[in-house]
Amino acid sequence: MASSHSSGTFTDAGPDDAATRRNGKRTLGDVQGTLLGLAHYLFNFVRGEAASRPALREQATELLRVRMWGIEADEPHRKALAAGDLILVFLGAPERKFIGQAELASAVHDWTPFEAQVYPGDSRGGVLLAEVEEWDPPVPMSTVLSQIDPAENARADFEAGIVRVTANEYETALAVAAARQPRAM
């Protein structure tokens, strides 16, 4: 469900299947365009087939709160995801809004029996999340795109549930989110 499909790309920062790893960890320079060996991804969440399920944002928020994200076997970048990678959580069309960010606490794995009981979806495996931050208000993709150089060819729609993004795209989304947060008095 979390990896259903929409259409287009934000800017897929390129393939990472050639990334070399040492001792199970990504090393500096493994993947072009990464910051200190970390990769940046957009997790694209779109409406599942069942109309009786809760609204899109509530479904995605539930995954963030349990700190788990289901990843299907055919998902692009599945094998490249590693603990420490950074993600943006995006609600696909028609919402087209970022609702948070997180750090991956694990690589993709089959759920343990305990994780399978806790996970609110139907995926057989996925990643664990750490440093989860929900964004309220959510950040419209159009606002982020307006801050990115048009030469980067960033777009708002995606065919894949996981899209590799550049460090600049990731940092731009964080900056826009920070500027939108209510200020404490």
Q: Language-model segments: which ranges?
A:
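Compositionally biased, charged N-terminal/linker segments
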Residues: 3, 10, 14-16, 20-83, ...
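Aromatic- and Lys/Arg-enriched surface recognition patch
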Residues: 97-167
